[in-house]
């Protein structure tokens, strides 16, 4: 059997967090600009920005992000960061990526919501021009934040009409802030008639994913709980929801305690819409090439599986119809 060149495969990524995916060299550059001291040794720095291989919980995993927040407080920093993440993706043959970020986490020093979105989109455009990747931005509301603040952030974001800002998400502490707890914010985003994805099913609570499906949300970040819930999986498939799966991240946070607790094979057998993602390239010390290697190792995923999942990702993406057509053609050619 011919060995698969996982790096060479064309790839699509829908679930990648900006602040969790910065390269060490970019972290150092941003720290220099912000006049923040970092450990000189890369291994020591990595310990601060990469979560433990096994965390006690999702909240422990999220602690790594606190280290990055002070570095992303200017337009310049956000542009550099967005360019860096899209470049990393392009260099492993990702042809389309959606990079998500929370404006709130970059407003500590006076940036407006609009400024954060403009800065991120500028960085993504630079990478698009240089590497030929199509790179788009998603805006996250933080579910644990003050709801009136989040409502204002979402409204200001909705005023931005940039073709590279394509949708919304809610991230953060799912366990304590499930869909019902932030329902007014979800309804607010739905009223915009703009695309939306949603983190649910990462913290072991099937009700949260069920609520997300009932609210009509068609893309779901993680969906890990489907491994344990056959009836919910049936609903997921029946409603045409697409799962943004993040294997390494789920094993770290214990959303999936072992590979057997990860929903991929059950979702595949049920005919669910599946996409493969990194979640956080740096915090999880991964990239899509590594993820594909793991799917092949643990689940015997084939090149045809990867083609199918990438096709699903394009169809579920928030790209324009013209971009989707172009991407589907590029993907078909790459896998022919």
From Swiss-Prot:
Q: Which residues bind Zn(2+)?
A: 15, 17, 199, 279
Record-linked Pfam families: A_deaminase
Keywords, ordered alphabetically = Hydrolase, Metal-binding, Nucleotide metabolism, Zinc
The enzyme class is hydrolase
**What cofactor does this protein call for?**
Zn(2+)
Give any single GO term for biological process: purine ribonucleoside monophosphate biosynthetic process
Q: What SUPFAM superfamilies does UniProt report for this protein, alphabetically?
A: Metallo-dependent hydrolases (SSF51556)
Residues binding substrate are 17, 19, 172
Q: How is the cofactor bound?
A: Binds 1 zinc ion per subunit.
Q: Which InterPro entries match?
A: A_deaminase, A_deaminase_dom, Ado/ade_deaminase, Metal_Hydrolase
Tagged with keyword Chaperone: no
Q: What is its EC number?
A: 3.5.4.4
Q: Name one GO cellular component term.
A: cytosol
Lineage, top-rank taxon, reads: Bacteria
Single annotated GO MF: adenosine deaminase activity
Active site residues according to the UniProt entry: 202 (proton donor)
Q: What catalytic activity does the UniProt entry give for this protein?
A: adenosine + H2O + H(+) = inosine + NH4(+); 2'-deoxyadenosine + H2O + H(+) = 2'-deoxyinosine + NH4(+)
Indicate the annotated site residue(s) for Important for catalytic activity. 222
Tell me which NCBIfam families the record gives.
aden_deam (TIGR01430)
Belongs to which family? Belongs to the metallo-dependent hydrolases superfamily. Adenosine and AMP deaminases family. Adenosine deaminase subfamily.
Q: What does this protein do?
A: Catalyzes the hydrolytic deamination of adenosine and 2-deoxyadenosine.
The name on file for this protein is: Adenosine deaminase
